[in-house]
């Protein structure tokens, strides 16, 4: 019997093993809450393309690094775009959803981003340091990330690879948004324990920093996370704009913040479903 409620396909890899966190717990919690307003089914990311046409919206959440299933993800994107399937987060993003080319582009344009290059001959444009970080353009969750000495850079295969100086920072901080609205912020006050997150109270400058990247991105409907580091001189530098499947660390916020987030997510999904 039809309920008349919007039908949502929630995409998650419940078995994905993340370092220091259990992503599946977050999706179990969110789907339990969303069922109050939607007819909802959960599926693995490799099944999303086959199932998505029976739903009013597809919510992509903790679906694991695309690096592990690039061809299948590209096929899902193409099919969803061609047939007009509503996807949350929208597939128009220019952040991690499209790879990490945006880090190169934003750095070249003078935005406050960790200096980034993708060619050995451009390493001289980076701040001088003895240690660098190399990571895949289509990586996520630190997959494929390696730390290399300056003298070892010529031995790297720069195909789809980014290189950055290893930054000496005070702490990492993340700002969480639904559509273009700020929800909460968390930070890791101890850099060696980056998964031990605590509530962060951003000031006006912090919020302006995060909002500039949300406004730059081509996403109207979806969840985005702006990851930054606080340099020793006090400046914030963008680490990542995660607009594909950002982990939300909802277990690290207080119940009232968690409730407000669920309410905002519900409202955003209803807006997406109502879109012509």
Indicate residue ranges for each PLM-predicted region.
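Short amphipathic alpha-helix with an adjacent loop that forms part of the alpha/beta core around
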Residues: 47-54, 78, 123-128, 152-155
């Amino acid at each position: 019997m039809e309920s008349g409620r919007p039908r949502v396909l929630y995409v998650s890899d419940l078995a994905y093993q993340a370092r220091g966190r259990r992503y599946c717990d977050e999706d179990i919690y969110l789907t339990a809450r969303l069922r109050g307003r939607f007819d909802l089914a959960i599926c693995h990311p490799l099944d999303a393309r086959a199932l998505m046409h029976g739903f009013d919206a597809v919510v992509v959440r903790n679906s694991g690094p695309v690096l592990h299933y690039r061809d299948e993800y590209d096929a899902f994107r193409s099919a969803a775009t061609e047939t007009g399937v509503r996807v949350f987060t929208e597939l128009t993003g220019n952040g991690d959803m499209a790879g990490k080319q945006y880090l190169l582009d934003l750095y070249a344009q003078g935005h406050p981003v960790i200096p980034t290059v993708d060619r050995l001959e451009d390493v001289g444009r980076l701040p001088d340091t003895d240690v660098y970080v190399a990571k895949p353009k289509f990586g996520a969750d630190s997959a494929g990330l390696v730390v290399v000495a300056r003298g070892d850079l010529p031995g790297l295969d720069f195909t789809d690879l980014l290189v950055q100086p290893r930054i000496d920072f005070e702490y990492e901080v993340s700002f969480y948004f639904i559509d273009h609205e700020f929800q909460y912020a968390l930070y890791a006050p101890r850099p060696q324990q980056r998964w031990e997150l605590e509530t962060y109270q951003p000031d006006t400058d912090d919020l302006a920093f995060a909002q500039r990247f949300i406004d730059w991105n081509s996403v109207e409907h979806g969840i985005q996370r702006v990851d930054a580091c606080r340099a020793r001189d006090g400046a914030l530098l963008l680490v990542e704009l995660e607009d594909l499947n950002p982990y939300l660390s909802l277990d690290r916020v207080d119940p009232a913040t968690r409730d407000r987030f669920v309410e905002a997510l519900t409202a955003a999904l209803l807006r997406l479903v109502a879109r012509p």
